[in-house]
Amino acid sequence: TRRSSDLQLIVLISKPPAPGIMQKVLACARQCEKPVVVHFLGADEHSLQYEGVIPALSLRHAAEIAVATLEGKKAPKETSTRESLLAKARDSIGAMAAKQKDIRGVFAGGTFCYEAQLALLAAGLSCESNAPVRGATELRSRQQGTGHSLVDMGDDEFTQGRPHPMIDPKLRNARLLSEGRDPTTAVLLFDIVLGYGASADPCATLLPVLDTLRQEAAQAQRHLLLIAHVCGTEDDPQDRQQQIECLEQAGVLVADSNIEAARLAAFVALQRK
């Protein structure tokens, strides 16, 4: 691979490997003749300080570094949450009922669920998940979240005998409905994943669910904040911009990345403590 004339850069993304394996991977990366951007989710940044290896702090940061490196620019600092999103979140906080304090995350992408947990923990929040990272706890109930809970709907327990939620979102949408109806839920956090093989129009089945949740919350004198991000490119068959616009028209705060969405949710939860 390192001798390929077409290859310009390598990006390594993984959940943190065992220390011994990580050292071997990084030693191999250091020998590459091409730049190597590395993001091991949850790994200590200092453990990635190897000559020839460029550490990234998030999935988005890894992409930003890769683009900058290919353009001959200096590796950028990690992007902060946009003030426009923070302002909209502040407006929503004031409309919430007293019991609304929790983040409920429902993810089709397991890596996004993992990264979101890390973001909550970094903000000083405890959380639970069916796929907990170090520092998080197991779900107390597989059917319904309690406190701040983030569920990976692509986990084996949800996909045995049925399509992955990226392909068929029925089970994911049902979980969104269940978590959004909980009177303690302040933020409903989710992802939309585009690409070949994924649902042809994710928003088509999702929007009725979000509309139902909004109406029920209003009737109960609650305000449910919806936060999402769309993973994909303009070359994907689902039309990324159209999916974003549909979500925004439905009142969803659409972040540029999963890490921005998770940090925005954490910001709200900290204000609701």
Question: What kind of region is each of these model predictions?
Answer:
Residues 34-198, 202, 225-255, 261-273:
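ATP-dependent carboxylate/acyl-activation modules
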Residues 7, 15-20, 192-200:
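Glycine-rich, proline-tolerant flexible connector loops at the mouths of alpha/beta enzymes
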Residues 17-22, 233, 237:
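Phosphate/ribose-phosphate-bearing ligand recognition and processing surfaces
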Residues 8-9, 187:
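Residues at the N-termini of beta-strands
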Residues 1-4:
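Short, small-residue-biased leader/transition segments that mark boundaries at the very start
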Residues 202-209:
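Charged helix-capping and loop-helix junction motifs
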Residues 31-36, 215-225:
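A short helix->loop->beta-strand "cap" motif at the edges of active sites that frequently abuts
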Residues 9-14, 25-28, 33-40:
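Signature of multi-pass transmembrane helix bundles
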